From Swiss-Prot:
Subcellular location: Secreted
Misc. remarks from the entry: Negative results: does not show inhibition of peak current on Nav1.7 (at 140 nM).
GO molecular function, one term: toxin activity
Entry domain remark: Has the structural arrangement of an alpha-helix connected to antiparallel beta-sheets by disulfide bonds (CS-alpha/beta).
Highest taxon in the source lineage: Eukaryota
Stated family: Belongs to the long (4 C-C) scorpion toxin superfamily. Sodium channel inhibitor family. Beta subfamily.
Name the record gives this protein: Beta-toxin Cn8
């Protein structure tokens, strides 16, 4: 599974500025989803890879982004 990291409180994606390989996104993906996860900046959001099937990613059902 793959997807954007989501902030459970705001319903928004984790933003990033440096596209492609991105230490911030990689660190956040691993912290949220475990050591096996990968991550990079895609379309100015942190995109995580190698997630378990039940991982919660953006968009959250019935919750719009409220920054």
């Amino acid at each position: 599974k793959e997807g954007y990291i989501v902030n459970y409180y705001t319903g928004c994606k984790f933003a990033c500025a440096k596209l492609g390989d991105n230490d911030y996104c990689l660190r956040e993906c691993k912290a949220r989803y475990g050591k096996g996860a990968g991550g990079y900046c895609y379309a100015f959001g942190c995109w995580c890879t190698h997630l378990y099937e039940q991982a919660v990613v953006w968009p959250l059902p019935k919750k719009k982004c409220r920054a």
